[in-house]
From Swiss-Prot:
Organism, scientific name: Zingiber mioga
Molecular-function annotations in GO: RNA binding
Localization, UniProt: Plastid, Chloroplast
Keyword Metal-binding: no
Gene (name only): matK
Pfam families: Intron_maturas2, MatK_N
Protein's name according to its UniProt entry: Maturase K
Length: 515
């Protein structure tokens, strides 16, 4: 137990006690900007507020001055409650101040964690490599590891129903009681106010209106969840040498005393699953993958272990159907915009030895990735590039732009999709996406000039085709000199993983969320 507590104290030795005064300093945003923390919840245009995203940091910096007045926010909230039926202006002001407080707290609390991350990287002499941040960097790992695994659990990570659970986790990191009380007051008033307008306000809506604060609390929850999941696996070599009582404390060191009887039985039954030496864990956004070389029975043990773990540690129930167990040789799984699978190919070889000949059958495994064409067409349809059936249509909202801007926008989307889906082993779906975007571009130009799409294709066929393919071909040529072209019939099965994809295209990101 002392070893584990020391491990935790080492990570949490930088607890801050000065956060609350910083909330009322307008120049804290300058300090935040110096540490690369200037992203804001206002990065999307807020039509209700009437501000553009270019002035988001200035907006928050100026509005924080109004919080200097004593109990100004509390009086404003009480005044809103007393005049709730006056009109929509009350909701405007409450939403306005809630975003100020949410943004201010998120910026303040990110600073010590950012400094801790930078110092830890410097102490461990870990180089800052953008290649490791690429979403494509995970696929070579999958290609190398999944070939040796048998089963895979596709996990949809649950999140707490109430934000108070996330605040309780934050208490173990930050000792500033005033800041935590202010955050609890904000969340309490936020839910009370919205319950008067929209009954049963969900955490999903809170995540949309307070993105920065929500993602900070959510990432903290993911860190706690993964730490408690990975730590027993790392310590599995010591499990046979310690008593069951220490094992109970090692795994459930934060569990409440009333749950000890339940957890003791639970640990004794599930502890042996951590001894699997071929377990692999991968996470992205709200999904994770747990792969193992073991049996289906072992994966079911992992499934019920996770369900009970979320229930007894985080105090919320997770439905078992959120964890789907699949056999890699029979099923494919969806991850990061690709349908991935492990295919088994058989080959026959005839061997001749003197006068005798015999046949040998060999089985080889291959990691395969394909583009999910139907969900991607649905995403293009939602963006008004085509119909639900995949028929290209014009983009009316872009008809007011110049011709070169229209072509550049379509070309940029096409190149980004080609860039991201270059790892597909079958390119037919990628070519279909390019065809839809190319014809949608022609129809948009034709609608602007009140002409037909066929005439534009005849006049601009070569130029339009070059706009959609040239830049992508140059990038591939620089990275892979042996590849000459990337046209319709070139590099048909060549899979390329780029290590510069830090941000996913909006169409792909929409696909990740809706699938």
């Amino acid at each position: 137990m002392e070893e584990l507590q020391g491990y935790l104290e080492e990570d949490r030795s930088r607890q801050q006690q000065f956060l609350y005064p910083l909330l009322f300093q307008e120049y804290i945003y300058v300090f935040a900007y110096d540490h690369g923390l200037n992203s804001s919840i206002f990065y999307e245009p807020q039509n209700s507020l009437g501000y553009d995203n270019k002035f988001s940091s200035v907006l928050v910096k100026r509005l924080i001055i109004r919080m200097y007045q004593k109990n100004y926010l509390i009086y404003s909230v009480n005044d809103i409650y007393q005049n709730i039926f006056v009109g929509h202006n009350n909701y405007f002001y409450f939403n306005f101040f809630s975003q100020i407080l949410s943004e201010g707290f998120a910026v303040i609390v990110e600073i010590p964690f950012s400094l801790q991350l930078i110092s830890s990287l410097e102490e461990k002499e870990i180089p800052k490599s953008h290649n490791l941040q690429s979403s494509h960097s995970i696929f070579p790992f999958l290609e190398d590891k999944l070939l040796h695994l048998n089963y895979l659990s596709d996990i949809l990570i649950p999140y707490p129903v109430h934000m108070e659970i996330l605040v309780q986790m934050l208490q173990s990191w930050i000792q500033d009681v005033l800041s935590l009380h202010l955050l609890q007051f904000f969340l309490h008033e936020y839910y009370n106010w919205n319950s008067l307008i929209i009954p049963k306000k969900s955490i999903y809506v809170f995540s949309k209106e307070n993105k920065r604060l929500f993602w900070f609390l959510y990432n903290l929850y993911i860190y706690e969840y993964e730490f408690l999941l990975v730590f027993p696996c790392k310590q599995s070599s010591f499990l046979r040498l310690i008593s069951s009582g220490v094992l109970l404390e090692r795994i459930h060191f934060y569990v409440k005393i009333e749950h000890l009887g339940v957890c003791r039985i639970f640990c004794q039954k599930t502890l042996w699953i951590f001894k699997d030496p071929f377990i692999h864990y991968i996470r992205y956004q709200g999904k994770s993958i747990l792969g193992s070389r073991g049996t289906h029975f072992l994966m079911k043990k992992w499934k019920y272990h996770l369900v009970n773990f979320w229930q007894y540690y985080f105090h919320f129930w997770s439905q078992p159907y959120r964890i789907d167990i699949k056999k890699l040789s029979n099923y494919s799984f969806y991850f990061l915009g690709y349908f991935s699978s492990v295919q088994i190919n058989s080959s026959m070889v005839r061997n001749q030895m003197l006068e005798n000949s015999f046949l040998m059958y060999t089985l080889t495994k291959k990691f395969d990735t394909i583009i999910p064409i139907i969900p991607l067409i649905r995403s293009l349809s939602k963006a008004q590039f085509c119909t639900v059936s995949g028929y290209p249509i014009s983009k009316p909202i872009w008809t007011d732009l110049a011709d070169c801007d229209i072509i550049n926008r379509f070309g940029r989307i096409c190149r980004k999709l080609s860039h991201y889906y270059s790892g597909s082993s079958k390119k037919q779906s990628l070519y279909r996406m390019k065809y839809i975007l190319r014809l949608s571009c022609a129809r948009t130009l034709a609608r602007k000039h009140k002409s037909s799409a066929r005439s534009f294709l005849q006049r601009l066929s070569s130029g339009l085709l070059e706009e959609f393919f040239t830049e992508e071909e140059q990038v591939i040529f620089l990275i892979f000199p042996k590849i000459i072209s990337f046209y319709l019939y070139g590099s048909y099965r060549e899979r390329i993983w780029y290590l510069d994809i830090i941000r996913i295209n909006d169409l792909v990101n929409c696909l990740l969320v809706t699938t």
